[in-house]
């Protein structure tokens, strides 16, 4: 586990000021001002905002427009009105009724770093990040509201990206709307570096890249799949350790689609060990007993690197393997066959 300063970008300001493609500023921590870039000309206002403010869902943005929290060139706006480039948009980023219904709950959190702008969480298995789909309580969002009550004023309690319920490891949370806006831009521009450790079934011989679009499974709507009309998704993987019937990988993301690593690795015939949804392939008998000991997918968000939204410093955190994955790997290493490893 570490919090390490890599370097400082001299003269670079990473506060919530969009770049030349969407120039803007923040009047206060609840107000965002943007200039519509020319490349969005012809879009509806809600469509343009969905691209400029990807940290918030389109339905949320539409709600703000309908509540008169969005103006275009100082005039009231509608969702359907077109933008043509150059307009000044002002957004008052308020709460929705759904935000206000979430309750603070005293759930322990493992916090690796916290200041006035960020919280870095080391998430355990079993913790849902955001309420929904039958998990309305006991989530990371509920825990954050208890830990830092001021997050009730930040949409989604500052959450800007997610991990699946049973994926462990590092998450960043923004403590202000300004920080949330900046972190979302970093994610959109793919400058946030997210690295994972994954144990997959079967032996992979070479490093590789999976570049395949991901969308809803055409039949099983609660699952994701590689589909032709899905959203672009790209996952890099590097072989760290090879066993007779499984492989330890270092995975890194260029995009952040739902279940991306799980779906991409399944698509190349190597599902995650223990995955209850995408790991339908039976493990090799030589490792079956060890894999069965892990009641979840063997996926850990090991490393997170980002630019601090206020100071401009590039920061890196690492999280050690959780006990269950470490025990699984040790059990496999103890089996009577050799492995080949290389350093991270």
From Swiss-Prot:
Q: Which GO terms describe its biological process?
A: enzyme-directed rRNA pseudouridine synthesis
Sorted UniProt keywords = Cytoplasm, Isomerase, RNA-binding, rRNA processing
Species lineage: Bacteria, Pseudomonadati, Pseudomonadota, Betaproteobacteria, Nitrosomonadales
Q: What does this protein do?
A: Responsible for synthesis of pseudouridine from uracil at positions 1911, 1915 and 1917 in 23S ribosomal RNA.
- What Enzyme Commission number(s) appear in the record? 5.4.99.23
Q: Where is the active site?
A: 164
Molecular function per GO: 23S rRNA pseudouridine(1911/1915/1917) synthase activity; RNA binding
Which gene is the coding source of this polypeptide chain? rluD
| GO cellular component assignments | cytoplasm
Q: Where is this region: Disordered?
A: 1-29
Report the family membership.
Belongs to the pseudouridine synthase RluA family.
Q: Name one Pfam family in it.
A: PseudoU_synth_2
Tell me which InterPro entries the record gives.
PsdUridine_synth_cat_dom_sf (IPR020103), PsdUridine_synth_RluA-like_CS (IPR006224), PsdUridine_synth_RluC/D (IPR006225), PsdUridine_synth_RsuA/RluA (IPR006145), RluA_PseudoU_synthase (IPR050188), S4_RNA-bd_sf (IPR036986)
Q: Where in the cell is it found?
A: Cytoplasm
Descriptive protein name: Ribosomal large subunit pseudouridine synthase D
Occurrences of domain S4 RNA-binding (ranges):
43-116
Instruction: Write down the chemical reaction(s) this protein catalyses.
Output: uridine(1911/1915/1917) in 23S rRNA = pseudouridine(1911/1915/1917) in 23S rRNA
The record's annotation in CDD domains points to: PseudoU_synth_RluA_like (cd02869), S4 (cd00165)
EC class of this enzyme? Answer: isomerase
């Amino acid at each position: 586990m570490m919090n390490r300063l890599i370097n400082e970008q001299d003269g670079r300001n990473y506060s919530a000021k969009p770049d030349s493609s969407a120039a803007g500023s923040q009047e206060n921590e609840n107000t965002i001002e943007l200039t519509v870039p020319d490349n969005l000309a012809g879009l509806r206002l809600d469509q343009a905002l969905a691209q400029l403010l990807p940290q918030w869902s389109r339905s949320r943005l539409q709600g703000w427009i309908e509540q008169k929290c969005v103006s275009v060139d100082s005039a009231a706006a509608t969702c359907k009105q077109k933008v043509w480039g150059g307009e000044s948009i002002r957004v008052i980023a308020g709460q929705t009724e759904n935000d206000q219904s979430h309750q603070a709950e005293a759930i322990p959190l493992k916090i690796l770093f916290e200041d006035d702008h960020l919280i870095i969480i080391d998430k355990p298995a079993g913790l849902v990040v955001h309420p929904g789909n039958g998990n309305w309580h006991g989530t990371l969002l509920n825990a954050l509201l208890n830990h830092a009550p001021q997050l009730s004023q930040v949409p989604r309690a500052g959450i800007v990206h997610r991990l699946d319920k049973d994926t462990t490891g590092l998450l960043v949370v923004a403590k202000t709307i300004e920080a949330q806006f900046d972190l979302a831009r970093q994610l959109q521009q793919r400058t946030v570096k997210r690295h994972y450790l994954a144990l997959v079934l079967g032996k992979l011989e070479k490093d590789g890249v999976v570049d395949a679009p991901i969308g809803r499974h055409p039949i099983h709507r609660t699952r994701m799949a590689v589909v032709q009309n899905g959203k672009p998704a790209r996952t890099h993987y590097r072989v760290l350790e090879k066993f007779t019937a499984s492989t330890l990988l270092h995975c890194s993301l260029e995009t952040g689609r739902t279940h991306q690593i799980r779906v991409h690795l399944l698509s190349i015939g190597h599902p995650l060990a223990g995955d209850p949804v995408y790991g339908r392939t039976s493990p090799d008998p030589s490792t079956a007993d060890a894999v069965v000991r892990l009641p979840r997918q063997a996926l850990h968000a090991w490393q997170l690197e980002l630019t601090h939204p206020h100071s401009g410093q590039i920061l890196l955190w690492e999280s050690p393997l959780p006990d269950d994955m470490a025990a699984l790997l040790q059990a496999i290493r103890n089996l009577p066959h050799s492995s080949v490893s290389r350093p991270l």
